[in-house]
């Protein structure tokens, strides 16, 4: 799968002051909210992100920044994206350590993702306002919320009789009272590999 890279203008700060971040944008390239990967990459680079890299078309941006500047960079990038998207996107920000920690958790243990199942993580914009008793299921949509962490939820999506799979974002937002954005388990593992500099298969 292709990725794109860009470099922002040089800065006098030492590279050791910077940390690698993942920005997960909500509702990008759906419902007419279209932004190309090059434009997404350039928005973060021009906002001050370093070593910017995008992955897939679902709004995944990896970049380096000083911890004290990262929120300003995200805010400036979102302002640049507003004309294309019609509104500034909601962004869920995570560090490499946080993404690696997701892979060490075991909520999907025993869920081998056969052809009739999909696995998702919903990244939340904040801590859950509600902590429902688990699992929470929506049989009409074939969705099961199986685990709620500090800012992530694990969801299994079962194939419906019509052959479609339910998408978990609205389901999770109703359950925990916080907005979020979903990525399937395969994408999460590939993003973790990108963080570590490994290959993406």
Where in this protein do the model-derived segments appear?
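Short Lys/Arg-rich cationic patches that frequently serve as NLS/NoLS or arginine-rich RNA/DNA-binding motifs
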Residues: 1-11
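Surface-exposed, charge/polar-rich loops and edge strands
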Residues: 5, 14-58, 62-201
């Amino acid at each position: 799968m292709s990725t794109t890279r860009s470099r922002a203008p040089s800065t006098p700060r030492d590279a050791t002051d910077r940390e690698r971040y993942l920005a997960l944008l909500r509702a990008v390239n759906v419902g007419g909210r279209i932004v190309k990967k090059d434009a997404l990459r350039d928005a973060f680079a021009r906002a001050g992100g370093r070593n910017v890299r995008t992955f897939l078309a679902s709004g995944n941006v990896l970049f380096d920044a000083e911890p004290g500047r990262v929120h300003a960079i995200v805010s400036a990038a979102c302002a640049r994206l507003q004309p294309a998207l019609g509104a500034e996107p909601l962004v869920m920000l995570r560090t490499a350590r946080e993404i690696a920690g997701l892979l060490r958790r075991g909520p999907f243990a025993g869920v081998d993702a056969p052809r009739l199942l999909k696995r998702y993580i919903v990244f939340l914009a904040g801590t859950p306002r509600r902590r429902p008793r688990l699992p929470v299921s929506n049989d009409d949509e074939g969705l099961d919320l199986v685990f709620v962490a500090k800012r992530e939820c694990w969801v299994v999506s079962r194939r419906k009789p019509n052959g479609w799979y339910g998408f978990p974002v609205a389901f999770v937002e109703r359950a925990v009272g916080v907005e979020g954005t979903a990525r399937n388990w395969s994408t999460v593992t590939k993003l973790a590999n990108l963080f570590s500099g490994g290959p993406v298969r």
